[in-house]
Swiss-Prot record:
Belongs to the tetrahydrofolate dehydrogenase/cyclohydrolase family. GO terms for biological process: L-histidine biosynthetic process; methionine biosynthetic process; purine nucleotide biosynthetic process; tetrahydrofolate interconversion. HAMAP family: THF_DHG_CYH. Keywords: Amino-acid biosynthesis, Histidine biosynthesis, Hydrolase, Methionine biosynthesis, Multifunctional enzyme, NADP, One-carbon metabolism, Oxidoreductase, Purine biosynthesis. Homodimer. NADP(+) binds at residues 164-166, 189, 230. Pathway: One-carbon metabolism; tetrahydrofolate interconversion. Its EC number is 1.5.1.5, 3.5.4.9. This is Bifunctional protein FolD. It comes from the Bacteria.
Length: 277
């Protein structure tokens, strides 16, 4: 039995949906446009923006790559965001983080129009999300839920344990599992008896950024194991789960790379295709 939950495979299907949708739009004389803002020249952010651009272009989405000097003032960055908010041709805005230290990240992200906030960064977007109102879904948590559903893994009534309580993954994922009627426990650095808690999980999600932290002693026989973490070890991308050690014990498991991360950018671009939700 193949135990691998492949984000790459699921992403291929979603890309096909996006491509068909944008082709229909263009046939009617319409198009979608995303503006991606990069401040400075952080290597990881440059790579990610280029990857976004390539994927968007392949899927028929117009992509505006905005590169701003690292020394730009906070006021001028805010003016740029306000300009994009008012531009009716722009359907989605992405602001790559982190920002330079002299810029107040919270003040800037809160300026992004919630109806264009593809990454769900602003407090208005976050508020809509937690109140269950219509909004763009946070992409990494959405990737976890999308992957489970694509493989017809039952969530309702299941015991879910999430290791990690970040604002980007752990907290919104907790809410999304609640919305699916799971019983959810969130663990963190102060959790006592972590192994015992993890062993209760039907679905174990790990998002802490510590390479190979979770071994088979944390996993109950037959659990579904979702690895969200990415770290570089000896030049290779590695997850939070010791894949080789856990594989035999899990019923299904995500690889790193090739699992959750393979879906995130695709779902980010799907966000702008509102009719596909």
């Amino acid at each position: 039995m193949d135990k691998i939950l492949s984000g790459k495979t699921v992403a291929i299907d979603i890309k096909g949906q996006i491509k068909s949708y944008t082709e229909e739009l263009k046939a009617s004389g319409k198009s979608l446009k995303i503006s991606s803002i990069l401040v400075g020249d952080d290597g990881g952010s440059v790579y990610y923006q280029n990857f976004q651009e390539k994927l968007a272009n392949n899927l028929g989405i117009d992509f505006e790559k905005i590169k701003l000097d690292e020394s730009i003032s906070e006021e001028n960055l805010k003016l740029k965001i306000e300009e994009l908010n008012k531009d009716d041709s722009v359907n989605g805005i992405m602001l790559l983080l982190p920002l330079p230290k002299h810029i107040d990240e919270r003040a800037v992200t809160n300026l992004i129009d919630a109806d264009k906030d593809l990454d769900c960064l602003s407090e208005v977007s976050v508020g809509r999300f937690y109140k269950g109102e219509k909004c763009f879904m946070p992409c990494t948590p959405n990737s976890v839920i999308t992957l489970l559903k694509a493989y017809n893994i039952e969530i309702e009534g299941k015991e879910v344990v999430i290791i990690g309580r970040s604002n980007i993954v752990g907290k919104p994922l907790f809410q999304m599992f609640l919305n699916e009627n799971a019983t959810v426990t969130v663990c963190h650095s102060r959790t006592k008896n972590l192994k015992e808690v993890c062993k209760r999980a039907d679905i174990l999600v790990v998002a802490i950024g510590r390479a190979n932290f979770i071994d088979s002693s944390y996993v109950r026989e037959g659990a579904v194991v979702i690895d969200v973490g990415t770290s570089e070890v000896n030049g290779k991308i590695t997850g939070d789960v010791n894949f080789d050690d856990v594989y035999d014990k899990a019923s299904l498991i995500t690889p790193v790379p090739g699992g959750v991360g393979s879906l995130t950018t695709t779902l980010l671009l799907k966000n702008v295709c509102k009719e596909l939700d």
